[in-house]
């Protein structure tokens, strides 16, 4: 019984599109990262200038989908002609149409179209990823294509009366033309299937008397061969631009041709353009072109002004205009070898371009098409235009100086945004945001922009004014476009880099290492000592990075302090450090500038504990708050006045100061607000609304906010009457009341539009209070007795709205401990306001403030770290008081610090949602901002051992993801990573591409080489071994391997080394001990493969290195280690895997695995085993060994050292294609987690006592679990329960974390895994009782909760898995990502679901389980 948890989100951008999704005037960037859908907007930075504008991408929101995104398309529908809807295609053959709900500030599912059963029933092939295409001119039809099966979904379009008359005339003419109709019987059958397999959702109807009219028709499925009898195997299919009817271009092949049989057959590709008649489901052939080169595999439709299509092959480009005229370009010298019609090609073979996996981007309103190779080089495909006809096409190299800051590696889709900006999805590196700028004089550039603006204005005017003459508009538009083309044709382009999205993929390997081994920093224990970090690779070639993923933030500590007894501290204006001893009721002043010398002040209250210290007027005045007194001092601590008369006999619990406003909370449940005038040294009391006189107040906050901006001007927004309700529904609905008249008029007159932006007003001073019954109340300074509350905040509902305050108070049971309403962000953007709520159980809830077009609302952030639990389910988490501390500037971030036994830091970057990071493995009791000569905008925090550390937030880490990450550029692709613990270094096996010299074993050229293409050789690889120092993450030594040699696998092992003694096992009981009395030493073992062409055998070498200490170079303390070669041996067959086994090492070479013993004079083979194909994975656990084979599945082998032998224990009978594997240990149960090449995790169990296992010889498949990305690597890690890890400090009797690493040996082991899209996950064992609770809860969440895009979580995880064993998935692996959604539901919903799980006490048990799952990676 196990659970799966994804603890780092995917980051590789696979799909992207730019569209008017939220605003009709501004394009949004929408990206798909595996299962993560993100919506961005472009913002202009404050430091921008007219000549040098600077833009950034800002995340609006993200949504985790229950499926893998395979395509994104924007569509403009009759429901809302002002905004785009989004078509989200997910694996394997389904797509959802979604829109933006402005009122709820989230996506809304319009419809789900499901074709998987239909397609699977129509083909014998296993269903794989399908392709979604959309008609681009009128958005009249979409097509989901799986090979030759086409699923068409027609859409209704906005048509004019003239268009309808022309269509009627065309229909009459079409009756006399020959058409290829689809069989009527099949048509009816497909129509019935499409109706049963299409799910429509409509939640936003505004009409009550009639059903809303759908904007799409029934879908139908046909085979591509019915479009035209000449079509055989479809290679690619796309819709073309600027046709009045839906027109498709189809690439197809009639016979299989490849490079090996070109002598026998060439030019097998056919290109055909067809016009679709969606009503009759028939086609009309426009033109057909035969005998195209075999490796043409892509169609690129070109928009106006170029039109036509580009056909892309590996070795050529072909342009086909709308009349079927071809213009061909040969881009390398292979073209003459692969086609019989080379004479018709324009020869630009000297460019030597390789067009595999290139990106082709038509630049908007330009005569050039941008061609980006997979290596990142830019080229222009230039079209010489003569009016609307194309005279000539040629390819030009783009000067590298114009894009020197833009690095691309395997570029993918390109999204076109506003202001000539392009976003390029980069598969093997970061995805950049670039801007196309015309480099001529400002006059030329202005002319171009002004003309384009005029064209856009005319288009807008034509849409708004029905009385305009359309023909006259088109005439002027064409003239202006021609003028613009002339201007553009004379200009040069440069590409400006603005921003990029970080890509942590493809992550092919990782290891676990310690990044901070210093026991002490600044004379205090290092808070990050022995923390286990994840070291992974990302990117390829020049964009390769080494990622250091740490479990906590790594603060840069500059100095430290030690106290005898302190509970709280405050830094005042970088001059004074105030401390409060709550135990002895004492407060002290320390002067920072005088080496923290104590300062005596006769006015300062030092015989009481201090609740809070505040600064006023930029530190010129200081305010001290104690339980009984409030005193204002000058900056020399001379008393100016007190507020003691206001308090009388009451007791102060807490206080808040913002600007000149002071808010204090009393033990009686009252609150007082004062405005302090430091100029006159006086104060005034601000009266709170009288409605709150009888209300118990527990806490509150003072802020500058937009929250009450709308209701302060128009309180009618809160009136609950039918008129305003209907008005709001109409305004935010995607359907209009005028749809019913569209059949008669043929025109759409929808009332929907994007809501207006927030009014441009200044923030107002807002007082926020929390009542005893957990309501949040807000009012302005000049409130006029008006008071508002956030409805249902005590239930933590998904959205919070303002309402009038209800004076009727519920039962007083306060569980909200503290709140904040502040901006969060980084140096690029701090506009977003968040309401942060801390509960007494340590939970943190965050709500984002947004404007829906009428009023301000709050929306809950759902993807936050779980920090606490209700009902005392996590008492350890609150063993030290949790408090929120706001930092307006923490090294560039506006952030919130959370004190406690597990301290947290809340950060938000411009590219991410708010992230809650664990700050340290040690507790933080108090914290304050701090700056001095060493650090700027840092902090000082106090731990529970009375030690204070002054530190700053390191900016060389990235805080966009769930854990802090540091990226180190390597520059060469990484194959394997190892951490050498003894020397505290990291060893990398890297490789780079080199030209391949095709020689045989004797060094002679191999027969069959074509001499004419020597300047374009094939590529091979050259490996190297690099030693990296964590001191500054630089490469300190490199070992270059021979050409064609790559270090396939590399591991750090602790091996037994030494000579055998002469003793034998006899009467002497100590003889066996003597024989194996060897020294243990850590070595680096490298397995190398020598890879050449298929005619030559792949041999291998294994090498053993020791990392030794040396004297470092002057000024380079990191260079204190180097490699020392111990042994090497060549093998027959490449070495594909190595691992440590009981003090020895195993090498898989070819079809054999050999265990070797390391001795003083070399290595000795001691055991071997033959394998079927080759070993793709080998892992050990004690004397147990996993061997993974790509065809024959997984073996479990035992190793015995006396005598040396390898014993086959069990085999997998399903023949899983093993990519990687590792052990999961659940006390005395042994499991093997195996990842195959279909993105599926298989849990195998070795259980000799189970009769089905046949004495253990058969590994039982207990569960299978599908992931949304390819699994690349698995590593085992001890699992320590959070409750078992809690220890109690003997002096303070406070719960503290255990020493790191734990001294106890765990009987439980989990597995951490990486994927190609940059995400990381762990699979961990759980006990029977927790499994039952969580399984029932998971089923309830699947069935009862709403899922984005209408997707099914159950189908996502096990839908495509073929079960070959009756026992498989009787206890499936739990999806913790789904279960943790429980924590973000409203309180009523949570308790309702908990009651369905079990009876009494189940709510607390569920929370305990969730906390245990959330802390499974505590051993990092």
Curated annotation (Swiss-Prot):
Iron among keywords: no
GO BP term, pick one: termination of RNA polymerase II transcription
Biased amino acid composition, Acidic residues: 161-182, 462-483
Single GO molecular function: RNA binding
Primary location: nucleus
Thylakoid is among the record's keywords: no
Family annotation (Pfam families): Beta-prop_RSE1_1st (PF10433), CPSF_A (PF03178)
Chain spans, region Disordered: 161-210, 435-488, 722-760
Purpose of the protein: RNA-binding component of the cleavage and polyadenylation factor (CPF) complex, which plays a key role in polyadenylation-dependent pre-mRNA 3'-end formation and cooperates with cleavage factors including the CFIA complex and NAB4/CFIB. Involved in poly(A) site recognition. May be involved in coupling transcription termination and mRNA 3'-end formation.
Annotated protein name in UniProt: Protein CFT1
